[in-house]
Each structure stands twice: as C-alpha cells, then as structure tokens.
C-alpha cells in the first residue's frame, strides 16, 4: 500500500496505516483505502466522507469506488481530486437539507 500512502503523504494528508486498511484525512475529509479481499471481490476499495458528518462508513460514505490495482486507485486520486471533493460537498449538502426538513418542515 506504499504507492497510495506516499501519494497521501505527498499531498499533505495525515495517514494512519493498519494491516489491511489505510485512513488519510485533513481537517475536513476522511479517506479509507481497503486492500483487496473476498468482501471487495478482490479489488481495492476507496471510500470518502466529510469529517463533520462522519458516523461510520456504512452511514457516511459520499464516494465509494473499486479498482483492480493500487496504481489505478492512485491515478484516480490524482486525476479526480476536485470531483471527489465536489461529491463530498454534494453529499454533505443533501444531509443538511434532510436535517432542515426534519427540523422545520414536519
């Protein structure tokens, strides 16, 4: 997982690496990278969430993508950073809109 870990470190993310996963974060966003295993059909998995609304991955994932190779995942991060952040912002906006409806429209 060194290719991905180095990419995050080179781009200013705080990185925590475990046996089969890597978490990278800034003050606003959290990334989870999972090594291939049976649960991911042998693919690398990337999940991304806003830190402010993070509860657990099952409830908070704004982006979830799968890749055949570690290099493919790294290239996706490199080439799609703006789109990843846009998707996280869109997801966060939808969450706040739902909270507003629950609190003020019911």
Language model regions located:
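Amphipathic, interaction-prone secondary-structure segments
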Residues: 11-54
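Acidic, low-complexity intrinsically disordered regions
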Residues: 3-4, 11, 40, 53, ...
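Mixed-charge, Lys/Arg-enriched low-complexity segments
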Residues: 52-106
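Weak global preference for isoleucine
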Residues: 3-4, 29, 33-34, 84
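Negatively charged, low-complexity tracts enriched in Asp/Glu with abundant Ser/Thr
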Residues: 1-27, 57-60, 94, 98-106
């Amino acid at each position: 997982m060194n290719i991905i870990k180095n990419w995050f470190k080179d781009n200013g993310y705080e990185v925590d690496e475990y046996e089969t996963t890597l978490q990278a974060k800034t003050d606003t966003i959290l990334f989870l990278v999972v090594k291939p295993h049976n649960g991911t059909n042998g693919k690398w998995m990337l999940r991304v969430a806003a830190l402010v609304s993070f509860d657990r991955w099952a409830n908070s994932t704004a982006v979830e993508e799968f890749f055949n190779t570690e290099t493919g995942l790294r290239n996706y991060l490199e080439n799609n950073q703006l789109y990843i952040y846009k998707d996280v912002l869109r997801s966060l906006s939808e969450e706040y809109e739902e909270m507003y409806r629950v609190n003020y429209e019911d």
